[in-house]
């Protein structure tokens, strides 16, 4: 099944900066959407064609001419300097779950641009005032936060929550071991928050242990455990039952989101969703990272060390005590994270293959024999057929992290609720133009903006 090491096809046919969008449709097309101001209906793919013309079938887009392969696009996104771009302010809330665990929600705070005198062109703001406010709200014992991010006071949090009466909500799920601080997530948050002169309230849900969130229950994220997403969304819906809620998932976050959508089926509280650069099949994704020479040498070790670092910074909470006895046999439903020891962490720090990490930590916690078994079970392509809400999917065939073999052509054609937009360029989550702006994030924002405005 798997290939020995090989050099990928890096030929002129895979180079370029003028990309093209292609719709993947079944014979019956896509599900009809009802307009809010009339009795008219329109299929999802026709809605995109008419109201998001930059995503219509055959649409062209232009990327940075110097980043002319998916490898270069993705490498620049991960290693380039974006410190002066996407100047988003976040207000952080600690989210407590029913099992005693926590994550954090970073609410986009566009009003802080005025509060802290943001000069976007110079990428400057009143850092002294922000620092004073940050010190006044920072909870004791929690790590310092990324730039332009601070905890909300109780009064600010109450005001933030009150927006639920007036603003539709967009929830953003980040990539593997990432968070709100990542350039792509900041770009997405910025684009979403500017739709319709600020029509959306936007929040990034940072997974347990990510983006300087704490782990409190000796439990960390996996692609199979969507309970935190479910609990957060259900809580938001319970607070404001009439509020429209949307979600955007990026990379691993897209896998989490589409797993959740498939599990919820007809009971999903979301009105629409967007999945960007989803690694639909984790086995094929691992194969790409392990056996594609370029992907292996450029990205595999980095992703593996992202995971290892997440464990390391949370080791005080994750570490099992000496002579720890497992109280029950680990299962997917009742995992036991019993392999989180200092000895295993030392092993993981030498890993270069993500499968090594999941063999040691993730699979045993669920009673699975190995990481590949976990990958097969956790792949969101398994749950795509049961997605029942309008969902926009964007994947690039030159994605150097997932490869094009993960793209779910058959399943997308068979599910009228989804529209798969295949692009021939863009890399993994990158799609950077000559100004280092992301074409991809703008498509997600444009789609949700038009959907919220026009669809019932």
UniProtKB/Swiss-Prot annotation:
The domain of life is Eukaryota
Q: Which InterPro entries match?
A: AB_hydrolase_1, AB_hydrolase_4_CS, AB_hydrolase_4_sf, AB_hydrolase_fold, ABHD4
What are the EC numbers? 2.3.1.84, 3.1.1.-
Q: Where is the active site?
A: 251 (charge relay system), 399 (charge relay system), 428 (charge relay system)
**Locate the AB hydrolase-1 domain: which residues?**
168-434
Reaction(s) this enzyme catalyzes, per UniProt: an aliphatic alcohol + acetyl-CoA = an acetyl ester + CoA
Q: Which GO terms describe its biological process?
A: medium-chain fatty acid biosynthetic process; medium-chain fatty acid catabolic process
Give any extra note attached to this record.
Present with 573 molecules/cell in log phase SD medium.
Q: Which family does it belong to?
A: Belongs to the AB hydrolase superfamily. AB hydrolase 4 family.
What's the protein here called? Medium-chain fatty acid ethyl ester synthase/esterase 1
This protein's species is: Saccharomyces cerevisiae (strain ATCC 204508 / S288c)
């Amino acid at each position: 099944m798997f290939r020995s090491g090989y050099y990928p096809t890096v030929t002129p046919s895979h180079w370029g900066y003028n990309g093209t969008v292609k719709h993947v449709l079944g014979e019956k097309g896509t599900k009809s959407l009802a307009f809010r101001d009339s009795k008219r209906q329109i299929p999802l793919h026709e809605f995109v064609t008419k109201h998001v013309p930059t995503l219509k079938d055959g649409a062209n887009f232009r990327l940075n001419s110097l980043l002319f392969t998916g490898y270069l696009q993705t490498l620049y996104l991960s290693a380039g300097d974006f410190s002066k771009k996407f100047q988003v302010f976040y207000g952080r809330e600690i989210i407590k779950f029913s099992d005693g665990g926590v994550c954090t929600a970073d609410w986009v705070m566009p009003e802080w641009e005025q509060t802290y005198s943001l000069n976007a062109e110079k990428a400057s703001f009143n850092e002294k005032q922000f620092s004073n406010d940050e010190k006044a709200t920072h909870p004791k014992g929690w790590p310092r936060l990324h730039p332009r991010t601070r905890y909300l006071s109780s009064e600010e949090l109450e005001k933030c929550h009150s927006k639920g009466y007036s603003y539709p909500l967009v929830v953003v799920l980040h990539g593997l071991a990432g968070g709100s601080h990542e350039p792509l997530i900041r770009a997405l948050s910025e684009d979403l928050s500017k739709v319709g002169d600020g029509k959306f309230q936007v929040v990034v849900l940072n997974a347990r242990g990510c983006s300087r969130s704490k782990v409190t229950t000796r439990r960390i994220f996996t692609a199979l455990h969507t309970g935190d997403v479910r609990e957060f969304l259900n809580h938001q819906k319970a607070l404001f039952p009439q509020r429209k809620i949307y979600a955007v998932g990026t990379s691993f976050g897209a896998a989490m989101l589409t797993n959740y959508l498939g599990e919820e089926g007809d009971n999903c509280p979301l009105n629409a969703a967007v999945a960007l650069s989803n690694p639909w099949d984790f086995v094929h994704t691992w194969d790409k990272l392990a056996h594609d020479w370029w992907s292996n040498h450029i990205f595999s070790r980095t992703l593996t060390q992202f995971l290892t670092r997440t464990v390391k910074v949370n080791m005080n909470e994750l570490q099992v005590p000496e002579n720890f006895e497992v109280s029950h046999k680990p299962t997917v439903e009742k995992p036991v994270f019993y392999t989180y020891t200092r000895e295993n962490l030392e092993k993981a720090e030498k890993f270069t293959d993500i499968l090594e990490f999941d063999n040691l930590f993730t699979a045993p916690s669920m009673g699975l024999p190995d990481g590949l078994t976990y990958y097969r079970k956790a792949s969101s392509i398994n749950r795509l057929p049961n997605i029942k809400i309008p969902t926009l999917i964007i994947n690039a065939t030159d994605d150097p992290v997932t490869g094009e073999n993960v793209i779910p052509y058959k399943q997308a054609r068979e599910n009228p609720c989804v529209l798969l937009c295949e692009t021939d360029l863009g890399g993994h989550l990158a799609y950077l133009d000559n100004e280092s702006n992301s074409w991809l994030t703008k498509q997600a924002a444009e789609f949700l903006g038009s959907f919220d405005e026009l669809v019932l």
